[in-house]
């Protein structure tokens, strides 16, 4: 009879996974998000890609808050054009507050015209401000409230990544966003470091 109980347990686990609520409106964000503590340099460690041409790796973002409490960001990273031309490019974003301090509208554009531009939701799903942050954006909703075109970043303060206990937290947040195993790791090999004008846009 032990195998029967094993099947029951597996079925229950499978049912629990199948019943995960993937409607965007159900996703939890960081409570009492503090923009000032979040400001500074963040290194992208992993990314769930959207549709369109965005920065691909070596992504470093700098968030800042001005004297009026307005948050903005710049990001630099590598982009591959025409399948064989690597360039370093910059993107800029400005944030509009909403009723929830962890949910923003982000207007963004590339300094180079070939990069994607838009005005998307930008949610801070979780952060401890000192080690990690998980960001999420849904650009297009399905009729059932799930997301048809989303992107998400996992950021770190340290370009070398996270300790194991933080990795476990990040994985849980990815699962809660219904994006488990949909992220790709982002390399940091120094391609866009320095002031060289080689392949800069």
UniProtKB/Swiss-Prot annotation:
Cysteines paired by S-S bonds: 22-178, 88-192, 138-147
Subcellular localization, as worded in the UniProt entry: Secreted
Task: Provide the primary localization.
Answer: secreted
Provide one Gene Ontology biological process annotation: retinol transport
One GO CC annotation = extracellular space
**What GO annotations for molecular function exist for this entry?**
retinal binding; retinol binding; retinol transmembrane transporter activity
Name of the protein in question: Retinol-binding protein 4
- Provenance organism: Equus caballus
Tell me the classification of the organism that encodes this protein. Eukaryota, Metazoa, Chordata, Craniata, Vertebrata
């Amino acid at each position: 009879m032990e195998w029967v109980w094993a099947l029951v347990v597996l079925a229950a686990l499978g049912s629990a996974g199948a019943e995960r609520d993937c409607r965007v409106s159900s996703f939890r964000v960081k409570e009492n998000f503090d923009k000032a503590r979040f400001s500074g340099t963040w290194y992208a460690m992993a990314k769930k890609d959207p549709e369109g041409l965005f920065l691909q790796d070596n992504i470093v973002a700098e968030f800042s808050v001005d004297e009026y409490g307005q948050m903005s960001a710049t990001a630099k990273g590598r982009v591959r054009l025409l399948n064989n031309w690597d360039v370093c490019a910059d993107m800029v974003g400005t944030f509009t507050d909403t009723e929830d301090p962890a949910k923003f509208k982000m207007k963004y554009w590339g300094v180079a015209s070939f990069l994607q531009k838009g005005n998307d939701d930008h949610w801070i799903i979780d952060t401890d401000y000192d080690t990690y942050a998980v960001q999420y954006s849904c650009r297009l909703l399905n009729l059932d409230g799930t997301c048809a075109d989303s992107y998400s970043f996992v950021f770190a303060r340290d370009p070398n990544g996270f300790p194991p206990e933080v990795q476990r937290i990040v994985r849980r947040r990815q699962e809660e966003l219904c994006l488990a195993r949909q992220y790709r790791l982002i390399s940091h090999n120094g391609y866009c470091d320095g002031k060289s004008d080689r392949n800069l846009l």
